[in-house]
Amino acid sequence: MNILITGIHGFVGSNLVIALKKRHILYGLDIVAPEKEGVVKTFAWEDIESTSFPMQRLPQFDAIIHLAGKAHDTKNQSVAQAYFDINTGLTQKIFDFFLESTAKKFIFFSSVKATADSVVGDALREDVIPTPIGPYGESKIAAENYILDKLKNKNEKLKLHDDRKQVYILRPCMIHGPGNKGNLNLLYNVVKKGIPWPLGDFENKRSFTSIDNLCYVVEGLLTKNVASGIYHMGDDEALSTNELITLMCEAMGKAPHIWKMNRKMMEGCAGLGTLLHLPLNTERLRKLTENYVVSNEKIKAALGIERMPVRAADGIMKTILSFSN
């Protein structure tokens, strides 16, 4: 297949190139265009403008994978409009191009944050009513809605079953792998310094997405006849912060320092921290200890598999081991 990947030089894009280059012909669309093994050519966004001359010379693509976007800023320092300009605006541009192109498949990388900042119930599923909080999630759901609106016909029914075009909206939870540090690296550095984890009394569960599992799913969507739709993406097993710390210590060859300090006492300290504007406050405690489990049952059923190829703990360990390299 001829595949166009936007944001091809980012973390996910680079891993997709490694996973797909042996069986497919890959092209990029990005703001930078360095030489990359396995990529025939990287185009600029101006090249897909309907008025541009290069657009007339673009290859005939079979599939488009849209990765380009502005990542979630955990420090909240980004201007809100930037999220909409990039996450929503670029999606509109590339999806319009897809509809006019010969490509048959479109994979859009959204996020679970487009649906919910917190999970109500045992797991986050595709039928949840989206209630994103903050410009990152809001810009992602706006992009999703643009795609869905474009797929509506005159009778206001979704044309998701059009055999000529198949559209997939992927909502992965936190993606990790060698080369992508993120929040896992922040926790790793705390553990590496020997700082005890005082919240061991909170046995929270969170879902993660191994980059290897993600590449496996994308390959499946490209090569199998999977129904168009919205699919959540995550590893099979959810892990607690205590389990993450234990895995990190195992990788470092040291004993974990997990303190199970009284839960009520820690909640009281966090409440006091809110009043006194201290680093540990009620909101930060909630973020550190809440459950965020994402169901991957729908995507597994669509691909006809019972399990993801990589266990959550194995994927996390692979990422952790890369931190010391």
What are these regions (language model features)?
Residues 298-300, 306, 310-325:
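Amphipathic terminal alpha-helices
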Residues 3-23:
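N-terminal Rossmann NAD(P)H-binding glycine-rich loop of SDR-like oxidoreductase domains
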Residues 224-280, 316-320, 324:
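Mid/C-terminal beta-alpha module of Rossmann-like enzyme folds, strongest
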Residues 93-135, 155-156:
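Conserved Rossmann-fold NAD(P)-dependent oxidoreductase catalytic core, especially the SDR/UDP-sugar
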Residues 211, 246, 269-306:
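Conserved C-terminal active-site "lid" loop/helix of NAD(P)H-dependent oxidoreductases
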Residues 47-89, 93, 97:
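NAD(P)H-binding glycine-rich loop region in Rossmannoid oxidoreductase-like domains
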Residues 180-186, 200-222, 228-229:
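Substrate-positioning beta->alpha
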Residues 85, 120-175, 196-197:
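Catalytic helix-loop patch of NAD(P)-dependent Rossmann-fold dehydrogenases
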